[in-house]
Amino acid sequence: MPELARRGFVEGRNLQLETRFGEPNAIPALARDLDRAHPDVIVAVSNSVVHAVASAAPGVAIVASYFGSDPVAEGMAQSLARPGGRITGIAMLAEALDAKRLDILHETFPTMRRVAVLSGRPPRNEASIEAMRATAQRLGVELTVIEADSPREYAPAFERMRAARAEALVVISAPDFNRDAAILAQAAAAAGLPAICEWRDMAERGCLLSYGPIKEQLMRRVAAYVVQILRGTPPGELPIETPTHFESVVNKKTAASLGVVLPPVTLIRADEVIE
């Protein structure tokens, strides 16, 4: 909103915003409802939402905030440089970032051998899980994937982590896990699991570690896409961008509550340490 206003689009003056939120199984219906509002552009979070919106709103420009996995491989763009069609946005390439988070977790706790991964149900996160399995094999770590698609499934998910004797947790890249970060961080703490998450604000809400792009920078880029489309540029002519800056955050308060000692290298490499 502030970035759109800075670029000349102010809600109530020359901009009308419609928002829809829901669990994964509700997304197609929400996308159809949104299309009935006749938007000029739709901002969609994650590949599955982009697919749903593309199907429900066949004539509307779409800005992905963000593609989780490769939009070219999934047939949503001809190339990153020139996507063609009506979809553009930010490609997170989450599979590489999720595998990197497993690396960071292992570097922080090098003796751990059993790691849980909190994931959505297939087909969500499949590319990330495949990349993480390859990383786990290289590290000599046993990976247990636990699936949950809504808050009511979190408690049983953490029970399964306990049953698997997990020693740490990777919360996979997903918008709903970001939304529920405080709930997940509390559950991880109750289970005695050091957790690494996606965004800085997830560490601020209680995850032990986070590693990912700088959200504020990405949102400015998403706003720039929206403005260019509203001013007449076809989305297919706007290159799909990938993040270029990443940050690592450590929550020492969470470390203290878990009773874990963080190695100096983890603290030295962190862009921010929450005391």
What residue spans do the PLM features occupy?
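Short hydrophobic alpha-helices and adjacent helix-cap/hinge residues
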Residues: M1-E275
